[in-house]
Structures are given as C-alpha cells and as structure tokens.
From Swiss-Prot:
Belongs to the Maf family. YhdE subfamily. InterPro entries: ITPase-like_fam, Maf-like. GO terms for biological process: nucleotide metabolic process. Keywords: Cytoplasm, Hydrolase, Nucleotide metabolism. Its cofactor is a divalent metal cation. This is dTTP/UTP pyrophosphatase. GO terms for cellular component: cytoplasm. It comes from Xanthomonas oryzae pv. oryzae (strain KACC10331 / KXO85). The active site is at residue 71. It catalyses: dTTP + H2O = dTMP + diphosphate + H(+); UTP + H2O = UMP + diphosphate + H(+).
Amino acid sequence: MLYLASRSPRRQELLQRLDVPFQTVQLDVPELRAADESPDHYVQRVALDKAHAGLALVQAADPDAIVLGSDTEVVLGERVFGKPVDVDDAIAMLRALSGRTHQVLTAVVLVCAQRAPAQALVVSEVTFDRLDDAQIAAYAACGEPMGKAGAYAIQGRAERFIRHLSGSYSGVMGLPLYHTSQLLTAFGAH
C-alpha cells in the first residue's frame, strides 16, 4: 500500500490525480533549517524525514508499505520562505516576492523497508507582478496565504499575480505530478 506522509489537502488532491490507491498518514515533522544548510538540501531532508516518520508509523501493520514524503519551499536568493506565522509575516513575504522571480523547490521521496529511497527535486521559477500595498493587504486578509510556503497559493487567488511560471505547476502547488508518477513507476507502485 502507498501512504502519503502529509497533512496537506493539496498534496492529497494532487496524488488522487495519479489514480493510485493510497492512505494518508498524519504526522508532525520538525521543519527547522540549519544555518549552513542549503535550500535544496533542506527541502530534500525534510521530505525524507517525513517519509521515514510515516514509514515508522505504518511498517508494523504493513511491512510492504511504500511511503511518499514531500516538502515545498519558496526561495528568493538564499532566503527560504516557509509558511507565514501570521498575517504580518504573510504581508512581509508577499512584499519581498512582489515584482521578482523566485524559485519553488519541491522534493518528493519514496521509502520502504526493502530498498533504498528514491527521490526527485523539482525546481520551478515563478515571477510575480508588482503588487501594491492594497493588493497585498487584501490577499493576506482573505486567509489564503496561511499554511502556504511563500504565503501564496498558485492555484487560488494568487494565480492572478503570476506573470510567468517556468517549471511544474503541480510542483508549485506541492507535488510535481510528472516526477511523482515517474518515481512511483520506478518503485513499482504505479
């Protein structure tokens, strides 16, 4: 059985599009970046930590379990934008992203007890239009930025702010479907 180690409703929705039966494992994994840790290493480590934590929860009941872990972070330069802690934090993130191109890093990892992990790192580039303070305040007030890396949901109201996207739309949402499908096939789970 395939298990998704994520609380994200977006990842659940995206994984359903691949027509693979799965169950969701609810867990909390610390997402703390070390001072000297690169953004790409960080996002891959967190995805692997989630997958291993999920496997630890289900392996006794399902020795053949395959667990998918994923993490998405928004990166501008060397600054990693996680999920905003409050509306003011969301506003600060959106101001920083306004009129600029940033990267969205999404790591996907598959683990099981019988083989080495398989993983992919998908890097997309997103360019925001210039946003004025009124646009930023209105978007932050709608609540959508909360719980989203970089304080925006590309599939929601923020889509109108995106001038250009290069890479994986589903990866920016939280689970790059092409790469996930390829990993599942290689792992024998698709």
